[in-house]
């Protein structure tokens, strides 16, 4: 079996994807697999045809990789692949759609308001609507970006127009959420129809917020296992993570990010990553390690889950 690790790509998360792809490629080589690394570009269909792979290990993040696009191409070409399918991928990458599903399923998520624009937006009108709907502080997000790209924290009325403008440079949609102060926790989920939640991780950023720099610079964030929260809150997060994974129809592996409000004794789902980072500073491999699963074994497990029910 020839495996192609598809990485790089055309999104703003290209650099992270190359690092993820490289780590996966080396792990599969160590395990003795016949493996090639494929840097995705506009000619990906021709490359896949030329390489004639039997299985694709998707290591792409963001646009065209995590949104159902590459999954659709692989389905057409009859190449089985790792992770979630077209629908789950396209739903999970869209934070607004994810929140609608979470609300419908009764899974706690921060209150929000969403906007969509085709023409010049009226920043004052948007600011006014946000202030009528939510209390400050708020978090403004580009709904289809990952790696904490396109996120602005707003603490005063005066900051709103500038923050809105900044996020709209990235996306034509806006997701505005209430800011929940608490403990940031992530749940790594592994499996298909019977998913398992690996040990929860508390994220402590050395910068003010867990942003792109804190996420990918060694030493700028700390991963604490188990999180320093009450056991019943950990249990809630595990239950909501599994429920979220199933509600979106995820497969293989995914990471569900939470904000834990200790005062309200609640775990709020923020978002779902259907292709979590697999770099040296990544959360998913850390959770697996805490469960006694080596990086190489984790990569092989994800590969096996991708093959389950998908062999040619």
Curated annotation (Swiss-Prot):
Requisite cofactors: Mg(2+); Mn(2+)
Pathway(s) annotated for this protein in UniProt: Cell wall biogenesis; peptidoglycan biosynthesis
Record's keyword annotation contains Manganese: yes
InterPro entries: ATP-grasp (IPR011761), ATP_grasp_subdomain_1 (IPR013815), D-Ala_lig_Van_CS (IPR000291), D_ala_D_ala (IPR005905), Dala_Dala_lig_C (IPR011095), Dala_Dala_lig_N (IPR011127), PreATP-grasp_dom_sf (IPR016185)
Binding site for Mg(2+) 1: 257, 271
Family label: Belongs to the D-alanine--D-alanine ligase family.
HAMAP family documented for this protein: Dala_Dala_lig
Protein name: D-alanine--D-alanine ligase
Annotated source species: Carboxydothermus hydrogenoformans (strain ATCC BAA-161 / DSM 6008 / Z-2901)
Annotated gene: ddl
């Amino acid at each position: 079996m020839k495996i192609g690790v598809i990485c790089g790509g055309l999104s703003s998360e290209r650099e992270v994807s190359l690092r993820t792809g490289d780590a996966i490629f080396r792990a599969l080589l160590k395990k003795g697999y016949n493996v090639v690394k494929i840097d995705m570009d506009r000619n990906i269909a021709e490359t896949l045809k030329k390489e004639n792979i039997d299985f694709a290990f998707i290591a792409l993040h963001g646009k065209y990789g995590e949104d159902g696009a590459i999954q659709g191409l692989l389905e057409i070409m009859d190449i089985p692949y790792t992770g979630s399918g077209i629908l789950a991928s396209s739903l999970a990458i869209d934070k607004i759609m994810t929140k609608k599903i979470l609300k419908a399923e009764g899974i706690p998520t921060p209150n929000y308001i969403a906007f969509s624009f085709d023409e010049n937006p009226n920043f004052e009108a948007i600011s006014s609507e946000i202030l009528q709907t939510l209390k400050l502080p708020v978090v403004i997000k580009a709904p289809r970006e990952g790696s904490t790209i396109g996120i602005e924290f707003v603490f005063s009325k005066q900051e709103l127009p500038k923050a809105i403008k900044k996020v709209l440079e990235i996306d034509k949609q806006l997701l505005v959420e209430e800011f929940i102060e608490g403990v940031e926790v992530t749940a790594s989920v592994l499996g298909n129809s019977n998913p398992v939640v690996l040990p929860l991780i508390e994220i402590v950023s050395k910068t003010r917020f867990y942003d792109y720099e804190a996420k990918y610079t060694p030493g700028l964030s700390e991963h604490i296992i188990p999180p320093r929260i009450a056991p019943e809150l950990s249990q809630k997060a595990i239950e909501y993570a599994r429920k979220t994974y199933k509600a979106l129809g995820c497969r293989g592996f995914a990471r569900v990010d939470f904000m834990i409000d200790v005062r309200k004794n609640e775990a709020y789902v923020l978002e779902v990553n259907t292709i979590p980072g697999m770099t040296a500073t990544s959360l998913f491999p850390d959770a697996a390690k805490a469960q006694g699963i080596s990086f190489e074994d984790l990569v092989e497990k994800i590969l096996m889950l991708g093959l389950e029910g998908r062999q040619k």
